[in-house]
Swiss-Prot record:
Residues with glycosylation annotation: N33, N135, N146, N154, N177, N192, N198, N213
Functional summary from the UniProt entry: Receptor involved in the costimulatory signal essential for T-lymphocyte proliferation and interleukin-2 production, by binding CD28 or CTLA-4. May play a critical role in the early events of T-cell activation and costimulation of naive T-cells, such as deciding between immunity and anergy that is made by T-cells within 24 hours after activation. Also involved in the regulation of B cells function, plays a role in regulating the level of IgG(1) produced. Upon CD40 engagement, activates NF-kappa-B signaling pathway via phospholipase C and protein kinase C activation.
Entry PTM: Polyubiquitinated; which is promoted by MARCH8 and results in endocytosis and lysosomal degradation.
Lineage: Eukaryota, Metazoa, Chordata, Craniata, Vertebrata
Gene: CD86
Cystine residue pairs: C40-C110, C157-C218
GO BP term, pick one: negative regulation of T cell proliferation
Topology in the lipid bilayer: Single-pass type I membrane protein
Residues annotated as signal peptide: 1-22
Cytoplasmic side of membrane: 269-330
Extracellular side: 23-247
Name of the molecule in the record: T-lymphocyte activation antigen CD86
Subcellular location: Cell membrane
Record domain Ig-like V-type: where: 33-127
Main location: membrane
Length: 330
């Protein structure tokens, strides 16, 4: 290798080392499923044409996101995970990464090489560090138990689909005289596909006699934000006394049973009586016979000593119907 080539290689290595050592990462943020702008911030002070430059971006694993080779895009060098997800803005020299996912966070590098008489020479490099955010849903409080005085109520609060991992979650009880924080049992989970977090907290809060009205809300803390739930109004109700069994209920029930029994007895007795008509008829016949005999005795008592023939006939007539009637009943 001649001295010229050795010297040129040394200069190239020196320039790259200088660029790498002095390169500072620019922190940028993007939201989940949105677009991130990966800057290059190259100042083309010499007004070089894109046909003289090679521009490309790579991630921290050295996978190529985009390459513009002498003014033409080269998709063959792009990693499959980035195909169709990038677009280059020639005016701002920003690379737009679309449909950002949690796994896209990390360091990205922009390289600019110039093609001269001696080949490609690196003239610019910039690092940028991408962080991905996803807003948690507004925390939502769910009441598990009823609210009464001198008893604890059970609450849960939950928020989902957020990133990065939340730091803390707690309840706040606000009354007329004080504001109190309540911790609870926190549960976190992370989706294996999206990388987003879900979080919930469960806790109990006790109300004293002097609390007439209050509000409860839930707070979710992340690295940079706090998210609040809607205020949940609390108006503890007085405990409902347990009523003892009332005596009048038992009395009414007993009365109904007795009345039903009497009605049933009378119904059965009447039905049985209707099924035996001969007994009544016999009693009626006996009563008629007794009356006839009594009449006859009265006739005999008042009978005159001498009865004319006509009177005897009349007496005979009076006796005959009675005897016939008695015979008919027998």
């Amino acid at each position: 290798m001649d001295a010229g080539c050795t010297m040129g290689l040394s200069v190239t290595v020196f320039v790259m080392a200088l660029l790498l050592s002095g390169a500072a990462s620019l922190r940028i943020q993007a939201y989940f499923n949105k677009t991130a702008d990966l800057p290059c911030q190259f100042t083309n002070s010499q007004s070089r044409s894109l046909s003289e430059l090679v521009v490309f971006w790579q991630d921290q694993e050295r996978l190529v996101l985009y390459e513009l080779f002498l003014g033409r895009e080269k998709p063959d060098n792009v990693d499959p995970k980035y195909i169709g997800r990038t677009s280059f803005d020639q005016e701002s020299w920003n690379l737009q990464l679309h449909n950002v996912q949690i796994k896209d966070k990390g360091v990205y590098q922009c390289f600019v090489h110039h093609r001269g008489a001696k080949g490609l020479v690196p003239i610019y490099q910039m690092n940028s560090e991408l962080s991905v955010l996803a807003n948690f849903t507004q925390p939502e409080i769910t009441l598990i138990s009823n609210i009464t005085r001198n008893s604890a109520i059970n609450l849960t609060c939950s928020s989902v689909q957020g990133y990065p991992e939340p730091k803390k979650m707690f309840f706040v009880l606000k009354t007329e005289n004080a504001t109190t924080e309540y911790d609870g049992v926190i549960e976190k989970s992370q989706d294996n596909v999206t990388g987003l977090y879900n979080i919930s907290i469960s806790g109990s809060i006790t109300f004293s006699d002097d609390i007439r009205n209050a509000t409860i809300y839930c707070v979710l803390q992340t690295e940079s934000t706090e998210t609040y739930s809607q205020h949940f109004p609390i108006v503890p109700a007085d405990p409902v006394p347990v009523e003892k069994p009332r005596l009048w209920i038992a009395a009414v029930a007993l009365t109904l049973i007795v009345v039903c029994g009497i009605v049933l007895f009378l119904t059965l007795w009447k039905r049985k009586k209707e099924q035996q008509p001969g007994v009544c008829e016999c009693e009626t016949i006996k009563m008629d016979k007794a009356e006839n005999e009594h009449v006859e005795e009265r006739v005999k008592i008042h009978e005159p000593e001498k009865i004319p023939a006509k009177a005897a006939k009349c007496e005979h007539r009076l006796k005959t119907p009675s005897s016939d009637k008695s015979a008919a009943h027998f």
